[in-house]
């Protein structure tokens, strides 16, 4: 992209006596000094990057952001930080906006690449840099004329939430800190990366962009520009507002508030494609957190639909992000987590899913684990949940006088406890279902003897409770239409239904027969495509 050499090894030492007292000459001296220390391709990249942002050249900005910056990072700064602000400021004429954006990338790189992670000072400085950026665009009387590619805006909001999550986990690890560090963290830096700051920023971006009104207008067939306002008319503010809704979904999910997580997305029709869902990483992240929230709310049918739809999308659009290794790794990991969550949901709430998703579950041996879960193996449920769940955080830091301990796992263990309590209530239901599927009528006493050959009258009474539990757990709230993901109608998700008359269970099989047409059409098309490729091979 840019040709250049490594850092000069024999750069002149910085000479305070070279300062003349003339601000212009001193700035020229600093520019030359820092430029001499910096590889040429890094220097040219920063100058061109700054110029592209000044001019609002989206094509060049996106190319440098997505391609050149990662390439230079790999070549020069694989496990080290990029040049500090003062070094960059000297060669970009102290451009305020560019320096804020550069520092966002600078601290993001430190979080991702530096062994051991960022220091406390770097975490705090990153927070204040985000404050500078958001104050610049939110507090302005008139819209800031800044053009950035949508992928950068998404990753900026996503990174903002990630660094909040990372700081909350760092703050909870008391065993790795001295008493002075704990005191400094809890007293001097109690407001930095606080949950109130994070929510305030995200809600402010949503409000200033009028994104909710715009989404409502679109759903009603009205031109969104009529309700967008001066700020929301600009793509920069509109997309930041949209991505902030997804950021709020993630924050509330990390806190374990699943109702509010779905609630903040009400203007977005979750199960429909929109013009705003053109960033694959954003769409995948949205579906992951929505599906997980549905699962924890015991809305398994909605969770299965959410996971199935996005996993099909990932299968069909891999080429969109496969060239970007960092995105590929992240998306592959999230896809693997969603397969684990889908397996859990299918065990707790069996239903038909797309054949291609079933094929992946078979190829990756999920069926063995699913069989163990159906047999009541709680350890498999636990391991799947721990692998696939978000890394939960506590909104509050540990108390200053709290015992020296690692509090990072407390939020996750609490969510695991809630989930496993639900699983324990359902672990006997697959056995009950398997017996009911064999009959159209079945006496209560006979079913009780199947479950326990030495069943007593008390066991028959307990069986009624189990059957009532089966009825209750198989009736879920299922979304059907409307912008709110919280709405829906109660439906039975089981492939069989029953009622009890005196001591007799009457069973009806409501299973819908498989439609094999789509499956064979896909296989025929795949075979024809393969046949064409074989014919084009020259032997």
UniProtKB/Swiss-Prot annotation:
InterPro entries: eIF3l, PCI_dom, TPR-like_helical_dom_sf
Localization, UniProt: Cytoplasm
Pfam families named in the record: Paf67 (PF10255)
GO CC terms: eukaryotic 43S preinitiation complex; eukaryotic 48S preinitiation complex; eukaryotic translation initiation factor 3 complex
Any one biological process term the GO annotation gives: formation of cytoplasmic translation initiation complex
Domain PCI span(s) in chain numbering: 306-514
Signal peptide span: none
Keyword annotations of the record: Cytoplasm, Initiation factor, Protein biosynthesis
Gene Ontology MF term list: translation initiation factor activity
Similarity section: Belongs to the eIF-3 subunit L family.
Subunit annotation: Component of the eukaryotic translation initiation factor 3 (eIF-3) complex. The eIF-3 complex interacts with pix.
Functional note: Component of the eukaryotic translation initiation factor 3 (eIF-3) complex, which is involved in protein synthesis of a specialized repertoire of mRNAs and, together with other initiation factors, stimulates binding of mRNA and methionyl-tRNAi to the 40S ribosome. The eIF-3 complex specifically targets and initiates translation of a subset of mRNAs involved in cell proliferation.
Protein name from the UniProt record: Eukaryotic translation initiation factor 3 subunit L
Gene source species: Drosophila sechellia
């Amino acid at each position: 992209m840019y040709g250049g050499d490594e850092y000069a090894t024999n750069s002149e030492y910085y000479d305070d006596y070279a300062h003349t007292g003339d601000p212009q000459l001193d700035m020229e001296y600093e520019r030359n000094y820092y430029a001499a220390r910096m590889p040429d391709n890094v220097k040219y990249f920063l100058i061109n990057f700054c110029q592209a942002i000044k001019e609002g050249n989206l094509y060049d900005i996106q190319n440098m952001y997505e391609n050149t910056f990662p390439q230079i990072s790999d070549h020069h700064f694989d496990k080290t930080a990029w040049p500090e602000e003062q070094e960059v400021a000297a060669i970009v004429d102290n451009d305020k906006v560019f320096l804020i954006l550069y520092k966002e990338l600078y601290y993001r790189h430190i979080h991702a690449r530096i062994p051991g992670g960022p220091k406390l000072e770097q975490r705090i400085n990153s927070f204040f840099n985000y404050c500078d950026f958001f104050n610049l665009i939110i507090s302005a009387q008139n819209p800031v004329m800044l053009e950035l590619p949508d992928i950068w805006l998404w990753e900026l909001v996503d990174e903002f939430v990630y660094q909040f999550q990372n700081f909350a986990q760092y703050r909870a690890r008391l065993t790795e800190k001295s008493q002075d560090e704990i005191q400094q963290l809890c007293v001097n830096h109690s407001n930095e990366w606080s949950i109130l700051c994070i929510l305030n920023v995200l809600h402010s971006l949503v409000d200033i962009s009028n994104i909710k009104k715009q989404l409502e207008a679109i759903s009603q067939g009205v031109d969104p520009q009529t309700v967008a306002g001066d700020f929301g008319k600009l793509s920069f503010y509109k997309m930041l507002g949209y991505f902030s809704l997804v950021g709020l979904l993630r924050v509330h999910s990390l806190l374990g508030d699943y109702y509010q997580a779905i609630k903040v997305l009400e203007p977005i029709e979750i199960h429909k494609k929109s013009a705003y869902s053109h960033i694959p990483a954003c769409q995948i992240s949205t579906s992951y957190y929505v599906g997980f929230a549905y699962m924890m709310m015991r809305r398994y049918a909605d969770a299965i639909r959410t996971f199935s739809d996005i996993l099909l999308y990932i299968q069909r659009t891999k080429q969109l992000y496969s060239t970007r290794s960092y995105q590929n790794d992240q998306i592959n990991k999230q896809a693997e987590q969603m397969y684990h969550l889908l397996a859990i949901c299918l065990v707790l709430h069996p239903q038909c899913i797309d054949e291609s998703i079933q094929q992946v579950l078979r190829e990756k041996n999920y069926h063995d684990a699913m069989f163990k879960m159906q047999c009541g193996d709680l350890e498999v449920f636990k391991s799947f949940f721990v692998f696939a769940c978000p890394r939960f955080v506590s909104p509050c830091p540990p108390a200053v006088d709290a015992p020296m301990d690692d509090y990072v796992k407390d939020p996750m263990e609490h969510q695991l406890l809630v989930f496993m309590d639900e699983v324990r209530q359902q672990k006997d239901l697959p056995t009950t279902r398997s017996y009911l599927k064999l009959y159209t009528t079945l006496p209560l006493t006979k079913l009780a003897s199947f479950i326990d050959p030495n069943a007593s009258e008390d066991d028959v009474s307990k069986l009624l409770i189990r059957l009532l539990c089966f009825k209750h757990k198989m009736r879920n709230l299922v979304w059907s239409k409307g912008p709110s993901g919280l709405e829906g109608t109660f439906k039975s998700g089981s492939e069989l239904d029953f009622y009890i008359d005196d001591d007799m269970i009457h069973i009806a099989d409501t299973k819908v027969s498989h439609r094999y047409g789509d499956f064979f059409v896909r296989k025929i098309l795949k075979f024809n495509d393969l046949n064409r490729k074989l014919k084009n091979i020259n032997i």
